[in-house]
């Protein structure tokens, strides 16, 4: 960004020019924005107009009491539209009621408007505005910085609250300074003093230590002036202060020590941040926390490059391919993307941009060259040679291969490569040496500079230059002489030469290498994998090769021998595939340093006895040497590790094996007799091999036998005595092998592969330390006892397998029984039960089995165990799906499963068991691997969304699947770990699991297979020994509020997966029977719906649609109830009879009266009758009632009213009236005890009471009208006389004081009872209770009948009575 682009234009009125705006300007300058232009004039002057046009960001201070200059506003908006200028509006002094500015800004698309508010001070408004301006001004520099900022803040916060030190490390231009500035801007306000010294090494060289200290600390922070004479003065002033110091681009630890003095003179909680491209700086400064800055990802890189190159959306499509080449070359390097983007700006056609980019690659940016050259100059000669060799020849090569060659050159690469890594010049990734493309080009430019200065080049890699040196000019004397390469090149100076002959064809002259006395590395190859030979030819012979050669790599070497005068005393590797060699050389040569011989597909080779002189030989690769008849006895080659003789068809016998050999490949040889440890040759066409392999003689140190099929092998001998060091045994595709002996003596055997042994029926026993077992496609019916060490078991396609012995302590971590159709479901269940116990035992400390996860217990867990825990799943399993499996495992239809986790489970939480059923299309055969991707989504209590995705690998490619399969995965990585800083409440909320099949590239397999059912189980230390189908899924839906469209959609998906009969049950509960007792609801619904209600409730509970409380009540979350009612309302227009029935039931005017008689109620307790009525259809019970009290109810803002019968003096009947907790439109009346007198007469009815039939126990109406209330037992009234069973009622004489005592006792007991009622739905609110009590002294319950809407009102207000008039009498 140029200087003019950093201008910030501020438009304001004069009243705020020296108040708010001055603070804003000063804050911007503190952030490094020095070009701030403030315009407070009413009119737009020429200078103001110029600044508006040049500014990158315009801040418009819009007042509430004055108008703004329309000229300035129009000009700013015009620049925003035509020049991509950023406008930041600030409403200052605008009251909330003044919405004109907000409406106008909203219409213009301003999504971010800063507004002064009563609760927001001016300082806070300044802070918000500055942050917004800064981010918009330096937008490109901020790309990709946020995620890095979070990571480094987390690293800082983990350090103890002493003086904290953090290093930021990375290659030049990767963004170290930008990240340090972001941290400084973010955290500087938390410190008493702070300073950021950019390019620290240069600053301290120019100003000196004392001047720099005075400039950064004393003048600004302590208010002192003058020269620092005593360092102790500064230390005293900063001793107890929290100080933030950022030293950028430090190249030497000594200058840090002189400036900071060991960091010990700052106050506690101070923070020192050092950025450097040299990791050794941090080590010498004792900075242990080091953050390595990575490059931008592809999306961020494309975004930055498009901005810098000014590529709009239309041009992006045309230039996308070229842009991706630039991005791939830059490899996420921000500085390179910025520089290349600006250089390529204006190139609108792909060919034009590509040509310009190729020119830029030839000459890297000077700023980057200087930075790399400065690091290069600090290296010693050996390290420089290593750097140049990697830049020219070894980019992306195996690190061991590079180490071996450079070690042979005497460069001590084990030390040198570490130095290059610390200086950010190379990296080691996936065991390969990596160098950024820019650094590689700079390294090669250093070589080219040598040519310009001395006319000499030490390393050659350009094909045209090498061709000019090697080509036989006599054969091409008529060709035009090449001028691209200097003829003054001195062959004696050449140390390395790598020639790619993919597009070349020429003749190499006879004396091409005579003068190359220092040539260490020589390689002729073809980079085109489709070309199997190199187009170069030698006419006659080759006179010589340099004796200092360490690497001789010559593909398709055309001669039968190497030059006789070549002395390979320094040779480390011979790699000559597809050569015409018959023998390496005649006579005896000293091969002391030779470690690798690769002569693959040298079909003329007949003798290899020369390798016996290579005492340090490690690798021999003679694959495809079809004329080679013998392999020498290599027993004395103590370092030999790898021998590959595959395809050597003329080799009939194999000699003594070296003691330390690790890998032996005899595939396709003619060997007919081998020890068991070598196993078999691979020659599919050879049918007369021995049917029995003899014992293990002389092979005690063989560690791996990587051999392919021996189709005629029928039996393995048991006569061996010495098991040796055999660690891997592969017998795959031995189609005639029928049995396998007991191999318990092979104690070091770790892997056994019997895949493809289609006739194998019997296995006697396995080695006790076996870790991997493959029985794919065998005919085994019963697997013997598995070893306790087994971790991986694959029995895919074992169609005859019926049982597996389960008398073992633990199971493999991963095992597959796909296409094992005869395997019983009980065996599958036993495996799952045992696997859960393994998870508990392996991943939970012993104390947690009883006491749960205490903090001390977690702290006692070893760090290594936790790291191992995060690497893999705890358990995975695959088997064919069975018909009755869905009901046992309770898999819900669909590919998603929703659960809610109770916070109390965290103490015993182990992980999750995820069960997925996958349907495969007919003829499915996977050729890209198969796995299942699990996406887990959740929200915490604050409503923040989280997401985690894990990919569960199921099997390798080539597996044909014939029917549906069930996959089970136990994941222990998802459990919260407070030691790692995770939010402990994160798993207390709604969690959604989504599953879909993927291939090896994690792309969905939509057409060939689909997830049909799934389920999730919570595994705790409590249920670890429980059968998988008896483990309840995570149920609790009510502990906290659920909200959001995403959650509602998940609930609807869960409902949609139900069968129709269970949908009906769900809707009845949502509309009618929430908070009701299961024993009451089950028989009632059974009369309405022909179903097993108990099982249906269990189905809904498993799907987390309801919960059955400890006292037997059905509980449904309010969001689910609301969803059910919406479904009824939405479906009401359809002809579905079920929906019509439920809809009509919810608005019906009939009354439900249900007599509850619980078996647990004692005989001396009064019966209760509950009447539930709709507020729009109130009912009558014929009696006259007097209100004697009311009290608040926990979990409800409204009271409960208490009434006693006033129809007859001395009656014990009582009732309670309250609002339903689930539906505010429903009133709940609870009758306690029975009346001891006849019904009122008609005369009394006219005076305030009515006559009717007894309401003791009304018939249950099958068409329910509304939700039934909670069932509560009445208080113990054993001291009272019992009510008569039926009229006529006996007259009783009761004293008035006894009645009052009874009322008070009932009220007190009820208060105590409600004190312990749990708050199930704190979010539910009831309607105004005053609407229920329409008169302060009289309560009327009315109802609406089908014939019309009629209400009855009681007129007796003098005695505090409530008159209930039934609709039957009113309808008369």
From Swiss-Prot:
Domain TIR stretches: 2-137
Renumbered ranges of LRR repeats: 491-515, 528-544, 545-568, 570-591, 614-637, 638-658, 659-681, 693-718, 723-747, 749-767, 768-792, 798-823
Region (Disordered): 1246-1288, 1337-1372
Biased composition, class Basic and acidic residues, residue ranges: 1270-1279
Superkingdom of the source species: Eukaryota
Gene Ontology molecular-function annotations: ADP binding; ATP binding; DNA-binding transcription factor activity; sequence-specific DNA binding
Described purpose of this protein according to its UniProt entry: Transcription factor. Interacts specifically with the W box (5'-(T)TGAC[CT]-3'), a frequently occurring elicitor-responsive cis-acting element. Also acts as a disease resistance protein that specifically recognizes the AvrRps4 type III effector avirulence protein from P.syringae. Heterodimerization with RPS4B is required to form a functional complex to recognize AvrRps4 and to mediate the hypersensitive response.
Subunit record text: Interacts with RPS4B. RPS4B-RRS1B heterodimer interacts with the bacterial effectors AvrRps4 and PopP2.
Domain notes: The TIR domain is a signaling domain involved in cell death induction. It is involved in heterodimerization of RPS4B with RRS1B, but other domains also contribute to the interaction.
The name this protein goes by in its record: Disease resistance protein RRS1B
Organism per entry: Arabidopsis thaliana (Mouse-ear cress)
Lineage summary: Eukaryota, Viridiplantae, Streptophyta, Embryophyta, Tracheophyta
């Amino acid at each position: 960004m140029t200087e003019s682009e950093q201008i910030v234009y501020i438009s304001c009125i004069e009243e705020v020019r020296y108040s708010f705006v001055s603070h804003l300007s000063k804050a911007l300058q503190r952030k490094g924005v020095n070009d701030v232009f403030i315009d407070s004039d009413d009119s737009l002057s020429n200078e103001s107009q110029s600044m508006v046009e040049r500014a990158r960001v315009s801040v418009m201070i819009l007042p509430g009491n004055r108008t703004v200059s329309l000229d300035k506003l129009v000009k700013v908006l015009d620049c925003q539209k035509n020049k991509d200028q950023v406008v930041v509006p600030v409403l200052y002094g605008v009251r909330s009621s003044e919405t004109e500015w907000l409406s106008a800004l909203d219409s213009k698309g301003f999504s971010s408007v800063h507004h002064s508010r009563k609760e927001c001070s001016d300082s806070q408004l300044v802070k918000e505005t500055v942050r917004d301006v800064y981010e918009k001004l330096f937008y490109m520099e901020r790309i990709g910085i946020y995620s890095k900022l979070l990571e480094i803040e987390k690293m800082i916060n983990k350090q103890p609250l002493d003086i904290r030190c953090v290093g930021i490390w990375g290659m030049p231009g990767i963004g170290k300074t930008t990240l340090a500035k972001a941290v400084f801007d973010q955290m500087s306000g938390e410190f008493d003093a702070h300073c950021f010294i950019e390019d620290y090494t240069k600053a301290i060289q120019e100003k000196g230590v004392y001047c720099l200290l005075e400039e950064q600390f004393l003048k600004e922070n302590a208010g002192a002036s003058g020269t620092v004479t005593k360092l102790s003065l500064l230390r005293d002033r900063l001793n107890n202060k929290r100080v933030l110091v950022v030293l950028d681009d430090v190249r030497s630890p000594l200058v840090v020590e002189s400036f900071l003095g060991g960091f010990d003179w700052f106050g506690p909680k101070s923070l020192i941040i050092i950025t450097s491209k040299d990791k050794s700086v941090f080590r010498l400064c004792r900075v242990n926390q080091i953050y390595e800055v990575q490059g931008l990802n592809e999306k961020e890189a494309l975004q930055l490059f498009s901005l810098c190159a000014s590529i709009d959306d239309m041009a992006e499509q045309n230039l996308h391919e070229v842009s991706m080449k630039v991005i791939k070359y830059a490899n996420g390097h921000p500085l390179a993307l910025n520089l290349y983007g600006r250089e390529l700006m204006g190139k609108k056609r792909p060919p034009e941009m590509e040509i310009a980019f190729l020119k830029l690659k030839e000459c890297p940016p000077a700023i980057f060259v200087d930075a790399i050259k400065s690091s290069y100059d600090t290296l010693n000669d050996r390290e420089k040679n290593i750097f140049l060799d990697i830049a020219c020849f070894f980019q992306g090569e195996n690190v061991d291969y590079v180490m071996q060659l450079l070690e042979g050159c005497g460069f001590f690469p084990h030390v040198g490569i570490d130095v290059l890594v610390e200086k950010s010049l190379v990296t080691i990734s996936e065991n390969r040496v990596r160098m950024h493309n820019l650094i590689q080009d700079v390294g090669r430019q250093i070589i080219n500079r040598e040519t310009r200065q001395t006319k000499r080049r030490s390393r050659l890699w350009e094909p045209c230059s090498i061709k000019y040196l090697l080509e036989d000019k006599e054969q091409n004397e008529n060709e035009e002489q090449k001028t691209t390469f200097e003829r003054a090149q001195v062959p004696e100076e050449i140390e390395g030469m790598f020639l790619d002959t993919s597009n070349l064809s020429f003749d190499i002259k006879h004396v091409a290498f005579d003068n190359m006395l220092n040539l260490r590395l020589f390689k002729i190859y073809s980079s085109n994998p489709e070309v199997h030979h190199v187009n170069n030819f030698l006419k006659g012979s080759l006179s010589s090769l340099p004796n200092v050669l360490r690497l001789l790599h010559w593909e398709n070497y055309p001669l039968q021998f190497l030059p006789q005068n070549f002395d390979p005393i320094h040779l480390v590797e011979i790699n000559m595939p597809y050569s015409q060699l018959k023998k390496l050389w005649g006579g005896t040569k000293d091969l002391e340093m030779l470690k690798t011989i690769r002569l693959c597909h040298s079909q003329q080779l007949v003798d290899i006895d020369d390798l016996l002189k290579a005492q340090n030989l490690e690798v021999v690769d003679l694959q495809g040497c079809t004329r080679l008849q013998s392999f020498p006895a290599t027993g004395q080659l103590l370092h030999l590790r790898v021998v590959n003789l595959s395809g050597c068809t003329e080799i009939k016998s194999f000699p003594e094996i070296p003691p330390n050999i690790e890998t032996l490949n005899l595939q396709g040889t003619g060997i007919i007799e081998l020890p068991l440890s070598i196993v078999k040759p691979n020659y599919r066409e050879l049918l007369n091999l021995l049917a029995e392999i003899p014992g293990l003689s002389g092979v005690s140190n063989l560690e791996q036998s990587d051999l392919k099929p021996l189709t005629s092998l029928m039996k393995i001998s048991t006569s061996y005595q010495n098991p040796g060091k055999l660690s891997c045994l592969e017998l795959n595709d031995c189609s005639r092998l029928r049995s396998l002996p007991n191999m318990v003596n092979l104690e070091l055997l770790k892997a056994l592969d019997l895949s493809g042994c289609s006739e194998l029926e019997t296995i006697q026993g396995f080695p006790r330390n076996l870790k991997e077992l493959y029985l794919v496609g065998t005919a085994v019916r019963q697997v013997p006892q598995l070893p306790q060490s087994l971790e991986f078991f694959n029995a895919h396609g074992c169609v005859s397998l019926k049982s597996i012995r389960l008398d073992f302590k633990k199971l493999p971590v991963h095992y597959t029984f796909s296409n094992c159709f005869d395997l019983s479901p009980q065996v599958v269940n036993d495996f799952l039960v045992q696997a859960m116990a393994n998870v508990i035992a392996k991943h939970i400390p012993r104390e947690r089995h009883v006491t749960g996860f205490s903090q001390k217990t977690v702290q006692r867990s070893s760090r290594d165990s936790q790291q191992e825990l995060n690497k893999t799943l705890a358990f995975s399993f695959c088997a064919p799906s069975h018909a009755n499996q869905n009901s046992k495992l309770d898999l819900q239809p669909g590919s998603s499963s929703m659960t809610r986790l109770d916070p109390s489970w965290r103490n015993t939480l182990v992980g999750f068991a995820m069960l997925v059923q996958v349907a495969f299309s007919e003829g499915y055969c996977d050729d890209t691997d198969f796995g299942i991707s699990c996406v887990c989504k959740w929200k915490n209590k604050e409503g923040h969304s989280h997401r985690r995705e894990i990919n569960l690998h199921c099997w390798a490619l080539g597996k044909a699947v014939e029917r549906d399969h069930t996959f089970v995965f136990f994941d222990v990585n998802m459990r919260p770990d407070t030691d790692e800083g995770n939010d402990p409440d994160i798993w207390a909320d709604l969690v959604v699991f989504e599953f879909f099949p993927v291939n090896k590239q994690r792309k969905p397999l939509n057409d060939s297979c689909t997830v049909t059912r799934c389920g999730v189980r919570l595994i705790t230390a409590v249920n670890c020994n429980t059968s998988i189908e008896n483990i309840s899924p995570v149920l609790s839906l009510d502990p906290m509020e659920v909200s959001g469209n995403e959650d509602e959609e998940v609930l609807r998906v869960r409902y949609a997966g139900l069968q129709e009969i269970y949908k009906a049950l769900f809707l009845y509960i949502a509309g009618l029977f929430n908070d009701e007792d299961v024993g009451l609801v089950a028989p009632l619904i059974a009369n309405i719906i022909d179903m097993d209600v108990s099982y249906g409730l269990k189905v809904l509970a498993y799907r987390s649609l309801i919960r059955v409380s400890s006292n037997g009540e059905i509980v449904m979350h309010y969001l689910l109830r609301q969803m059910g009612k919406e479904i009824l309302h939405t479906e009401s227009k359809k002809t579905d009879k079920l929906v019509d029935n439920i809809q009509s039931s919810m608005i019906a005017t009939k009354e439900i009266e249900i007599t509850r008689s619980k078996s647990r109620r004692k005989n001396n307790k009064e019966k209760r009758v509950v009447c539930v009525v709709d507020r729009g259809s109130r009912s009558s019970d014929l009696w006259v009632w007097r209100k004697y009290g009311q009290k608040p109810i926990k979990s409800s803002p409204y009271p409960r009213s208490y009434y006693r019968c006033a129809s007859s003096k001395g009656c014990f009947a009582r009732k309670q009236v309250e609002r339903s907790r689930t539906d505010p439109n429903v009133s709940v009346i609870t009758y306690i005890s029975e009346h001891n007198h006849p019904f009122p007469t008609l005369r009394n009815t006219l005076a305030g009471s009515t006559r009717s039939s007894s309401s003791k126990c009304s018939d249950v109406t099958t068409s329910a009208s509304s939700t039934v209330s909670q069932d509560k037992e009445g208080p113990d009234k054993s001291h009272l006389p019992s009510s008569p069973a039926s009229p006529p009622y006996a007259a009783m004489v009761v004293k008035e004081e006894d009645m009052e005592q009874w009322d008070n006792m009932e009220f007190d007991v009820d208060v105590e009872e409600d004190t312990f009622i749990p708050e199930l739905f704190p979010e539910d609110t009831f309607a105004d209770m005053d609407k229920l009590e329409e008169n302060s002294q009289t309560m009327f319950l009315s109802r609406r009948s089908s014939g019309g809407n009629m209400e009855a009102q009681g007129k007796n207000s003098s005695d505090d009575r409530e008159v209930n008039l039934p609709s039957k009498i009113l309808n008369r």
